[in-house]
Amino acid sequence: LIAVLIATPALAQTPSNIEAVEYDPNGSQWFVSCGSSTMLSTSDLGDTWEYFGTAQATHGMEVMGEALFVLDNNLIRAYDLNTAEQIGTASVAGASFLNGMGNDGNGILIVSDFSSGRILKVDATDPADMSVSTLVGNTGTTPNGIVVDTENGRAVIVNWGGNADILAVDLESGALTTIVNGTGLGNCDGIDMDSDGRYYVSSWSPNRITRFSNDFSQSETVVSSGLSSPADISFDETNHILGVANSGSNQVTFHQFEAEVNGVDIIDSNEASEVALLGNNLTFQVAQPGNYNISAFTLSGKLLDSMAIDIPAGTTNVSLERLPRMMQNAAVIHVSGTDLDQSFKLGLRQP
């Protein structure tokens, strides 16, 4: 398991009022919704952001074919991925709060109405002439994020509220089933799948990303730090990167995971833990998850600040720019933990 955390820096175009993130494999770019402001895109994992034409999105987004479909204040809009021009729009009668969206890759969108509990099916084969029907009249829950599991002919839905359930709805019949009866997670927001069929779920209580096996029989926490009210998520299956829209901080974070070989993560549990300073990142390579302490000192040895951080198993990059302000002026950074005790000289930043 590799979890890499990269935060977007403050630039001329900066994400704001964010709620959703979506990866476009056609253009190797990420989109982020910015509420009433123009949508932004990045091709360098958030180092720089650019306007995507004049497109707008308030909530869920899905790339399907050559179009980007978005939810925008209870409208469904379609934009051409190459030109950013709007190529279609659909209104939904009786919509209360359109929130999450998934697609089957073959012209069908599945949309959640957060407030009414409805699940909608949208035929978007022709983006200029979309048609909307009700797949589920009321889930009895507060449905949020959706991902379409095409192999099993279902949409998988996470829900808002305490100890939230995970539901599945048959794409043809609309039959509703409970996959997980009580996840132990509160206010689940986003869900997506990786190329191995595993599910990633974002939750606000606690702030974390949980990964479920493809049959939901097992779960594990894969990201537990660097998140703030994580909303919609998207998984880049080619590069094994999870993008998270943190609505609490208006930051998009990217978390890289290692691919599996025969269902097993490529991690040697016998390897000793290591940390290295690579560019502007502290790169941890640990076999088992653990808690580590990062301390910042002046060149003369004066302690500026310290912090504890949970590091998952695998490789994790911690950007120095993400550290508290006092630590960013350090001349020496010291990392300590159960199996680590190492210092790095950063330069003459403080007397």
Segments from the language model and where they lie:
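Glycine-centered tight-turn motifs at strand-turn-strand junctions
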Residues: 303-326, 340
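Structural signal for beta-propeller blades
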Residues: 38-40, 76-77, 117-119, 163-166, ...
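Short, glycine-anchored, charge-dense loop/turn motifs used at functional sites
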Residues: 297-303, 331
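Residue-level detector of functionally pivotal "anchor" positions at catalytic/ligand-binding pockets or at interdomain
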Residues: 258-281, 302, 343-351
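Beta-rich, blade/repeat-based domains predominating
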Residues: 14-28, 35, 53-73, 92-109, ...
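Short loop/turn segments that connect beta-strands within beta-propeller blades
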Residues: 43-47, 80-85, 123-128, 170-174, ...
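Hydrophobic alpha-helical segments and helix pairs
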Residues: 78-122
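A short beta-strand motif characteristic of beta-propeller blades
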Residues: 13-14, 46-53, 85-91, 130-137, ...
